[in-house]
Amino acid sequence: MLAQMISEELARILSLKEDEVERLLEIPPQETLGDLAFPCFTLAKTKRKAPPFIAAELEAAFLEHKEVTAKATGGYVNFFFHRETVAGQLFQEMKSNQYWQPNSGDGKRVVIDMSSPNIAKPFGIGHLRSTIIGHALYHLLKKTGYDPIRVNHLGDWGTQFGKQIAAYQRWGGDVDLKQNPIASFLELYVRFHEEAEKDESLEDEGREWFKKLEEGDEEADRLWTYFVKESLNEFDRMYNRLGVEFDYVLGESFYNDQMAPVVKELQEKGLLTCSEGALVVPLEDADLPPCLIVKSDGTSIYATRDLATAIYRHHVQKGEKLLYVVGGEQTLHFKQVFHVLKKMGYKWADQCEHITFGLLRLDGKKMSTRRGRVVMLEDVLNDVVAHAKAKIKEKHPNHPHLHEVAEAVGVGAVIFGDLKQDRRLDVNFRLEDALSFEGETGPYVQYTYARIQSILRKGDKLNDSRHMDWQHVTKDEGWSLLKVLIQYPNVLIKATEAREPHQLARYVLTVSKKFNQFYHKYVILADDETVRQARLILAERTGEVIADAMAVLGVKTPEEL
């Protein structure tokens, strides 16, 4: 709010672009030096003036300003906000949509490829990151004026289904498919790979079954349909628990009839070459290995389907930006796909983004399906919720909503524990750390919110904030909290544009920390009504920001813990 106003004013005075000014603005190391500082040293050469002289000129330009005082100190201009005026303006602004939904997207359609688990495999904890990062990005984009749609691009096609069918035909009678189909599918898949190490002909058998599937073989199609149906039932249970929804659930198979036209287009544009019986697009111009389009046995490959998918999302779903929330191990693949789209002449290929993320480890261990070492997300959630329930019950043995709150805290701890990290980094999930009610955790933020709601229940009915005496919330910890609340719209925009939900998670941790410092320094329910009302309004607005930010991240905020 105020930082933007100062940026705009400085940009106008100095004939600079606003983003240039924003990059130069600093937060002083001590509050006695002001709320914002602008260094003038980089301007000395272009303005042909000494930095202290530029600073003095800028101080004079802000003399008549009602909301801020500028003071030149050496080569810096330090800005001091008029605190009570700022507090009043902030609380008024918080009544407007612009605070809660700052529009930077102008209705642009963004298609988000997210979650995308593989059919016939369990919903392992390894699927969590794409699901919740994509979910948070959807809400960030929606908040900031974009028109996002969520697509679950199910892994329901590929040679692995030939292997799955071959395994089912050989050993399907050895597993309990009715009682637990997904676990049985995994058992069959693991057995196939163990047996294939002893008998290489099994790999050929798997390839042959996939070729039959692509050619419309009745038995192959029947089994594939069965695998898809049972898997979707399993996935939906997990999505309901995570609070995640989709606008479209379209597996790779949806694009089967669109791949031949893509191959034809590549041929017509002279982009395909033959390499050892396979068709590839050379990418030496981008310093990338060739992109495989059709394998030597005539079957399609991931890149073919992703090219067809991208074209569909742009032409049919009207995506102006296409986001792919997929792990970092697919970086080369997406570089190849995006560059092939460019070579095909699609200018919008520049609007395709790979939203990469690191591995999720459970106590330092990576997950794998091929060998069966997959950690089920449901097992992790059940374990975390059980521990959360025990912690809550210890403090509140007769909690009226114990199960509901434990679910919110447990699932929220898992989601927040992931999203608070830079998505590009590996995440090592440790249950005890994630569930702590102290430190940088989801439960800490939820506890802060519940504390605020408890205070508000004990307080008075709040008066019209326009007539408040804000001096009671603009000193020390109160001012520190207010300055953080001012930043919320800007944080939403920056987290969205950077595709970094962790910026919002870190922000809500800061809000919680600043509020708790304020809470421990001042009596909110003071005897003096004027003091009490001002502090209650600050508490209420803080709670609103916490709840709103956590909802964007996909974490619930119970009223009581």
Curated annotation (Swiss-Prot):
Gene Ontology MF terms in the entry: arginine-tRNA ligase activity; ATP binding
Record flagged with keyword Protein biosynthesis: yes
Localization terms from the record: Cytoplasm
GO process annotations (BP): arginyl-tRNA aminoacylation
Keywords associated with the record: Aminoacyl-tRNA synthetase, ATP-binding, Cytoplasm, Ligase, Nucleotide-binding, Protein biosynthesis
InterPro entries from the UniProt entry: Arg-tRNA-ligase (IPR001278), Arg-tRNA-synth_N (IPR005148), Arg-tRNA-synth_N_sf (IPR036695), ArgRS_core (IPR035684), DALR_anticod-bd (IPR008909), Rossmann-like_a/b/a_fold (IPR014729), tRNAsynth_Ia_anticodon-bd (IPR009080)
Family indicated by similarity: Belongs to the class-I aminoacyl-tRNA synthetase family.
Entry protein name: Arginine--tRNA ligase 2
Organism classification: Bacteria, Bacillati, Bacillota, Bacilli, Bacillales
